[in-house]
């Protein structure tokens, strides 16, 4: 019997001025996303992923401790609890990117994964934390992830998460494949002029190299007063052959929906035996910061 799964992505602009009280910003963004989740449900989506740090702006464009107030515990926090109810209502798996507080002063860029019956399955914490031009000052806000590369067994399929800047590192994408992922979601916040030319290269390459589907999500619009640039949207799904099968616009709030045939994974892997032909015993330099020179010295 074919394993077809209807999946959805939500890309959205910031709802309120960044100068408004944080509680108002959070409420406005959650209300906006709840309406879009309803749209995804009407389109019969079974698995849904929201964008990176979905309930606020991309505040990493500045270094300001004010934004620490957006943190919450996972899964005990209000956003995860709310989305558990929403997931159960719609019988929908939801990937929920939040700003997580582990303890005061220790924060993570996190995605909670909720099954279609509302059960919290676990979380992924972003591993690779950028601090670079034109305004990605994430080391001020986030501790590097410490939970590995989990794959979540949901009602509809095996789901992995790789957040934004993670996508530039093929190692974790490969581990997600080895861990059994069928669909990998990459919730992001990325702007034109820096990595847009990579947007449709890297993640289809991950899909091909690892034989799984990828859902890539980016927000839209500009967020003042920061001059980081335009978030260019263009959220998409691609299949294990690296083909983009549906893609959103670059400037509109959208719910992107695609039917994914999970049987394609086995079809592709019967042709391209990348997992069989791996040579992990030769990859020692990948586990050292200095690469081949350090491995040779050992």
Describe the function of each predicted region:
Residues 218-298:
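C-terminal beta-strand edge segments of enzyme domains
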Residues 7, 113-121, 238-246:
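Short, glycine-anchored, charge-dense loop/turn motifs used at functional sites
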Residues 72-75, 85, 102-182, 192-205, ...:
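Active-site catalytic loop in hydrolytic enzyme cores
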Residues 7, 37-66, 87, 94-95, ...:
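Active-site beta-strand/loop signature of hydrolases that rely on acidic residues for catalysis
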Residues 15-27, 137-138:
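Acidic/histidine-rich helix-loop elements
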Residues 96-98, 110-113, 150, 235-237, ...:
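Short beta-strand scaffold segments in enzyme catalytic cores
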Residues 75-95, 158, 164-255:
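CN hydrolase (nitrilase-like) catalytic-core segments centered on the catalytic cysteine
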Residues 1-16, 23:
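Short beta-strand segments enriched in small/hydrophobic residues
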């Amino acid at each position: 019997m074919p394993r077809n799964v209807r999946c959805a992505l939500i890309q959205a602009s910031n709802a309120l001025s960044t100068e408004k009280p944080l509680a108002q910003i959070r409420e406005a963004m959650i209300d906006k996303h709840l309406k879009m989740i309803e749209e995804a449900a009407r389109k019969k989506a079974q698995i849904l992923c929201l964008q990176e740090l979905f309930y606020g702006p991309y505040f990493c464009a500045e270094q300001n401790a004010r934004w620490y107030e957006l943190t919450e515990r996972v899964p005990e926090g209000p956003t995860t609890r709310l989305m558990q109810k929403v997931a159960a209502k719609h019988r929908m798996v939801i990937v929920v990117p939040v700003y997580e507080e582990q303890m005061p002063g220790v924060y993570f860029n996190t995605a909670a994964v909720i099954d279609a019956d509302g059960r919290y399955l676990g979380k992924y914490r972003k591993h690779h934390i950028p601090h670079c031009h034109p305004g990605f000052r994430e080391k001020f806000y986030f501790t590097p992830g410490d939970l590995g590369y989990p794959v979540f067994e949901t009602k509809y399929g095996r789901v992995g998460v790789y957040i934004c800047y993670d996508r530039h590192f093929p190692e974790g994408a490969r581990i997600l494949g080895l861990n059994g992922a069928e669909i990998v979601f990459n919730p992001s916040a990325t702007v034109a002029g820096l990595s847009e030319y990579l947007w449709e290269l890297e993640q289809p390459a991950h899909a091909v190299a690892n034989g799984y589907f990828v859902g890539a999500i980016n927000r839209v619009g500009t967020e003042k007063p920061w001059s980081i640039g335009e978030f260019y949207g263009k959220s998409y799904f691609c299949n294990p052959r690296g083909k983009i099968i549906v893609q959103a616009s670059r400037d509109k709030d959208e719910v992107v929906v695609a039917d994914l045939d999970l049987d394609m994974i086995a079809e592709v892997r019967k042709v391209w035996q990348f997992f069989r032909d791996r040579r992990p015993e030769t990859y020692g330099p990948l586990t050292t910061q200095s690469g081949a020179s350090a491995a040779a010295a050992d």
